[in-house]
Amino acid sequence: MRKKILFVCGSMNQTTQMHQISWYLGEYDQWFTPFFSDGLLGKASDMGMLEFTIMGKKRAGRAIDYLVSNNLQLDIGGALHNYDLVVTCTDLIVPKHIKRSKIVLVQEGMTEPETILFHLARNFRWVPRWIAGTSTIGLSDTYEKFCVASEGYRDLFISKGVNPDKIEVTSIPNFDDCERYLQN
């Protein structure tokens, strides 16, 4: 039996990035889901209150359309299987049942500037990371590895408090293919 991987998608950038990463892991049983949450945020999403986020129905619909058009297996909410590995582009929200699996976090792109909300979220665990946006990516420490774009980003995340032993410089699939733009 092949080991199972769940790819947690979101925006189209995140979704296409997860798809590209999956190409290198063809020996695994791969499943995909739009971004989701549990608890209060999950309920708010179900009620349509988070349409401005990657948990909104419109963005989830776009992700699902893309995944279906590429014949990828869907597991909406990641509850069909016990996954050996979860690959995601954000740890701002980590659903409880995902925490039972090994997680690889992949940097999606640039991070937002550090504001007072960043410092609150970093210094007080009761302040949710999502309130500070992408400036707090990597601070959950719920992952086995955090794949980042460059040495510069590695240094940035370390300065924010990310465990250096968990960071791997791998580049970012959607932004590291200059050759495809030679004939645009």
Question: What residue ranges belong to the model's regions?
Answer:
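Nucleotide donor/acceptor-binding cores
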Residues: 2-4
